[in-house]
Design a protein with these regions (language model features):
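Terminal, non-catalytic domain-edge segments
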Residues: 35-51, 177-178, 278, 284-435
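Low-complexity, Ser/Thr/Pro/Gly-enriched N-terminal "stalk/linker" regions
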Residues: 34-96, 122-123, 127-144, 180-187, ...
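N-terminal export leaders
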Residues: 16-20
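Carbohydrate-binding/catalytic loop surfaces
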Residues: 58-89, 137-157, 205-225, 263-290, ...
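Cysteine-centered motifs
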Residues: 3-6
Length: 435
């Protein structure tokens, strides 16, 4: 018996001798990996602020490795060159990108509590307010500004305006905003929302175009955008009418399956105009996350959580696209976007502007193949990564975290022309916030 006990003790010591190094090794690997991911996110942050945030606090679409880019002149903006939508110009997506990126900026400040990070979030907020102050058209949200800090393209869009609402709401409730800033933001939100409602939930545009895009409809994106706008306005103003509109809207039915908007939210993101479009749908998922955060009804909150989980699972399918990116790629990006003016012609309607833009883009990608690669293998999987991290279900998030981390560490940000890797930082801040 005594011998048996001795043998057991020896085995225990041997197991410990082997197990302890294994545990220590696993711990070291995990920590090294965490450091690698954190460093990649910090590099993305540094590169974004070095090259892509303009003097007015607005994120531009692209720049060279020194942060230089030729902006559209005021005359080109007025004439709609290369097109009145500003598609493939360097000031195409300022409202969209600023509004989305605010999520990362606020989460970064909450993590660091650094005054410098609060000021960065404030600068983005000021850029968003500027984009709502550059036109005589009430409720207009611009895409970006020209060299004079005011001139702009005549049309924004629903893709620009929802992130504008989302970003300002996120800043308003962050803890950074002063009382004066909160009041100013509320004024802009109310004025813009009221005008959109007056136009039947269409986005205001300048003459001769009238409007561009809508929050009305029964696609997930439209449903989430409209509900979020109502709920956010109620949160910011306390006005009962917005909550009443919100509750009525939830019950409305329509679409191919005659689902209620509540049910559509529960189903989550759906791709419908191409195989994947995480980069345009992510704002609607961000809006759903905002609805989940603001909702006090337990049953409704649970349904929003299901929608976020479904969205995360769908988005995760695009994460492997990041591995198709080649950091050594040297294909032409073509900084001179004005080559598109070869196809330019005057536009007087939204349809004419979009048709022109599509012709221009098709030709442009032939001389600028790098642009297509960055959008396919950087923009799409990084936006998907952020969508995954918006899910409040820890089990779902844990299952996809390794793949999200692979996306974050995939790129050499100093060699990218497009700013559309900013979702990398957004995803990491949410992972860090969860941990």
């Amino acid at each position: 018996m005594r011998c048996s006990r001795c043998q057991g003790a020896v085995l225990l010591l041997m197991n410990r001798r082997f197990l302890l190094p294994l545990v220590a090794s696993a711990w070291l690997v995990a920590n090294l990996r965490a450091d690698e991911v954190a460093q990649a996110a910090e590099k993305a942050h540094s590169e974004l602020w070095r090259r892509f945030i303009d003097a007015y606090g607005i994120m531009i679409d692209f720049a060279d490795m020194d942060g230089k880019v030729s902006l559209p002149t005021p005359e080109e903006c007025r004439e709609g060159k290369p097109n009145a939508l500003g598609w493939r110009a360097p000031i195409e997506n300022g409202a969209m990108f600023n509004g989305l990126y605010m999520d990362s900026s606020v989460n970064r400040w909450k993590r660091t509590q650094a005054a410098a990070d609060a000021e960065k979030a404030r600068k983005l907020m000021q850029g968003l307010l500027l984009l709502n102050s550059i036109s005589d058209v009430k409720g207009f949200v611009g895409r970006g500004v020209s060299t004079d800090g005011k001139s702009h393209y005549a049309m924004g869009s629903n893709d620009q305006t929802l992130p504008w609402f989302l970003g300002l709401w996120r800043y308003w409730q962050s803890g950074i905003a002063t009382n004066a800033e909160k009041a100013k933001i509320a004024q802009h939100l109310v004025t813009t929302a009221e005008e959109i409602v007056r136009l039947g939930w269409k986005m205001p545009a300048e003459p001769p175009f009238g409007t561009r895009g809508s929050f009305e409809g029964f696609h997930f994106e439209e449903v989430s955008r409209k509900l979020f706008t109502m709920k956010a306005l109620h949160a910011v103003t306390g006005a009962a009418k917005w909550q009443s509109m919100y509750l009525d809207e939830l019950a409305k039915r329509g679409g191919e399956k005659n689902l209620s908007k509540r049910e559509i939210c529960e189903g989550g993101m759906v791709f419908w105009y191409s195989k994947t479009h995480n980069w345009t749908s992510c704002a609607a998922v961000g809006a759903l996350r905002g609805l989940w955060e603001m909702e006090s009804d337990a049953a409704l909150k649970a349904e929003f959580a299901k929608g976020l989980a479904a969205s995360a699972k769908l988005a995760a399918e695009a994460l492997p696209l990041a591995q198709q990116w080649d950091n050594a790629d040297t294909s032409p990006f073509e900084m001179n976007w004005r080559v598109m003016n070869a196809d330019w012609k005057p536009q007087t309607t939204e349809k004419e502007a979009q048709e022109l833009a599509m012709v221009q883009i098709k030709s442009f990608l032939k001389v600028a193949p790098r642009r297509g690669k960055e959008t396919a293998f950087i923009r799409e999987p990084t936006a998907a990564a952020w969508i995954v991290t918006l899910c409040p279900d820890a089990t779902v998030l844990k299952a996809h975290t390794p793949e999200v981390e692979k996306v974050i560490t995939r790129y050499d940000f100093t060699k990218l022309y497009y700013s559309q890797f900013f979702w990398v930082e957004m995803a990491w801040e949410r992972l860090k916030n969860r941990s």
